[in-house]
Amino acid sequence: MSFVITFTSVIEIPAPSFDLAMSLDSGQVFHWQKTGKGFAGTIGDFAVYIEQNGNVLKVRDGGAPARSPRRPLPEIVARYFALDHPLAEICASFPGDAVMNTSRKFCRGLRIIRQPKWECLATFICSSMKQVAHIRQISLALRRRFGDQRRVGDQVVYTFPRAQRIARASEDDLRKCALGYRARNLLMTARLVSSGKANLEAWSALPDADLREKLCALPGVGAKIANCVMLFAYERLRAFPIDVWIERTLKQQYFPRKKKVTTLQLREFSETYFGEHGGYAQQYLFHHARTALRKSAAARDSSPAHRSARNDKGRDTRVASRKSRNRKRFLDSESACSPGHCGPFEVRGPE
């Protein structure tokens, strides 16, 4: 279904202590598209284009279909980006160790985005064993295939499909969105949500432990995904998702002398050490580690020594290919795996 909508005006929203680009690129949401100086995307059913100019967000409203209940646009945007969170107080509650301080300074202005519950749950079910770029591809594919089209100026965006729409799809249809085995989990969960057996809105009243238990009972949801949904959709700011980046960061930075640290030990440590805003601390640690690794890899690839090494390797490869192509392929495959270094963190990429 397509809705063609044009801009009506630009609305300015105060946004102190907020970094729009960093928040959208921190692994919380995956559908926003960089367009010009800003980003085009959807907040629920609403299509918007957002630019940041200092402490002000300039928002152009692409609108929503008439059937959608309409709240004032500034309220919609401010709530979505959690502009009401007392960020200075939250950061002041973090532990004062060097690792956390470095991440806090690096992530200044990053806020936990308040996401629609079904959209967040479904997206993170799709995220299992996937890197951020792949999650984005899946999210956009689901939106294009099953969502509603909007236009924000000249930019086409799509809403996230409702649970009822996914529930009517076939597993094969979902697999066409590169979901793989996750297609069945998403389909089964969508059917539970659309039937009312899993009432995501009603679960808002549950205490943390009960909410986590309810989420973990859904197909495709384990402790990590449950904590992501609790943090990003239910605003449980103590929730501390532990993925491969966080696990390695915790082990290397907080348990450097222990040869073996179990997942249970990491969970217990994170719950007590990072406190009532542990979810924010986790997001800062995650984004810092992931971003620093990318910058480190880019710097290494662009360095004169690395470029020279690549040129030398190319000459050596041409010589080797004349001797033995099979031998060359084997050596190339062996040389492709090297650990990355990311400033204060020493973190290897996903294996």
Predicted regions and their residues:
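HhH-family (HhH-GPD) DNA N-glycosylase catalytic core used in base-excision repair
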Residues: 1-303, 307-318, 322-337, 349
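Secreted/processed peptides and extracellular or luminal domains of membrane proteins
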Residues: 309, 343-344
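Short, intrinsically disordered C-terminal tails of secreted or membrane-associated proteins
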Residues: 344-350
